[in-house]
């Protein structure tokens, strides 16, 4: 049984202590006897029950720990079928650039993108903005999980492409990888792609601090919905061909509105809290 499915079963199993038995999926229901053969290298076919357990377990696990990229990836794959990933694939097929991406099957990694080249580009270019965002956040292009649980081979590539382009969405919007930034970007992605995982990720707003939650409702949620719905489908961007373009020009082309700088907002709030604390201590003394 795939490790992610076992993780999902363990998470669901913990519900036994708080839920009636009718809510529990017994491990006896899980079987590999009806598992079809893989459709592509690395593919792990799942039975309906396994897919359901994977969806429930990964949803609970990723809510408890939003930094578990493997669980978020599993949730995305388990909930993308039978409709949503096909809708996204059809959106690519209906777009000339999307069709080229499906034909060429480009991959985004440190092997396909030269970091040195990106750093040599003009400061306001897409490529330089992307690599500067990677440097600032301390991440790289090789951190994305490989798709395993989507049955259709072409749709599996669509999910892989979405996953590998995620950091470009971060870079173009300027949103950091802190939970507040991820929730805001996932809201944008949900409005733009309709992938269920991006919508379910919005429940992580419950883990935000009160002031962060208020900021999300008042500032980033309206931005994400407005910009995600108004912009062109970002899955159809051939990022490898846009690296030298001015990033503001690309935002205008796609119809993406850049949100307020979340890192600067958080820094300003910390400075204000520090100053207020110092003022209180001075007054008390």
From Swiss-Prot:
EC category: lyase
Pathway recorded for this protein: Cofactor biosynthesis; ubiquinone biosynthesis
Localisation per UniProt entry: Mitochondrion inner membrane
Catalytic activity as recorded in UniProt: a 4-hydroxy-3-methoxy-5-(all-trans-polyprenyl)benzoate + H(+) = a 2-methoxy-6-(all-trans-polyprenyl)phenol + CO2
Entry EC no(s): 4.1.1.130
Topology in membrane: Peripheral membrane protein
UniProt GO BP: ubiquinone biosynthetic process
First-listed, main subcellular location of the protein, grouped into a coarse class: mitochondrion
Annotated InterPro entries: Coq4, Coq4_euk
Transit peptide: 1-11
Cofactor(s) the record lists: Zn(2+)
Residue numbers binding Zn(2+): 166-167, 170, 182
Pfam families on file: Coq4
Name this protein carries in UniProt: Ubiquinone biosynthesis protein COQ4, mitochondrial
Organism of derivation: Paracoccidioides lutzii (strain ATCC MYA-826 / Pb01) (Paracoccidioides brasiliensis)
Source species taxonomy: Eukaryota, Fungi, Dikarya, Ascomycota, Pezizomycotina
Name of the encoding gene: COQ4
């Amino acid at each position: 049984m795939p490790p992610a499915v076992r993780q999902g079963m363990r998470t669901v199993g913990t519900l036994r202590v708080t839920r009636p038995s009718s809510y529990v999926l017994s491990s006896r229901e899980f079987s590999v006897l009806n598992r079809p053969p893989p459709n592509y290298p690395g593919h792990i076919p799942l039975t309906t029950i396994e897919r359901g357990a994977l969806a429930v377990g990964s949803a609970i696990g990723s809510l408890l720990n939003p930094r578990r990229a493997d669980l978020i990836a599993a949730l995305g794959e388990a909930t993308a079928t039978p409709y949503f990933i096909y809708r996204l694939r059809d959106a690519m097929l209906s777009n000339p650039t999307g069709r080229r991406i499906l034909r060429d099957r480009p991959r985004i990694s440190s092997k396909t993108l030269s970091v040195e080249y990106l750093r040599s580009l003009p400061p306001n270019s897409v490529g330089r903005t992307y690599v500067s965002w990677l440097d600032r956040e301390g991440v790289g292009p090789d951190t994305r999980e490989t798709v395993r649980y989507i049955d259709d081979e072409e749709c599996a590539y669509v999910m892989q492409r979405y996953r590998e382009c995620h950091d470009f969405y971060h870079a173009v919007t300027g949103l950091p990888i802190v939970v507040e930034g991820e929730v805001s970007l996932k809201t944008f992605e949900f409005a733009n792609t309709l992938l269920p995982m991006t919508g379910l990720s919005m429940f992580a707003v419950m883990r935000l601090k009160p002031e962060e939650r208020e900021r999300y409702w008042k500032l980033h949620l309206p931005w994400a919905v407005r910009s995600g719905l108004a912009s062109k489908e970002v899955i159809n961007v051939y990022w490898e061909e846009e690296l030298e373009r001015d990033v503001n020009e690309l935002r205008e082309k796609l119809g993406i509105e850049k949100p307020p700088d979340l890192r600067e907002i958080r820094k300003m709030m910390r400075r204000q809290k520090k100053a207020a604390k110092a003022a209180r201590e001075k007054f008390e003394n």
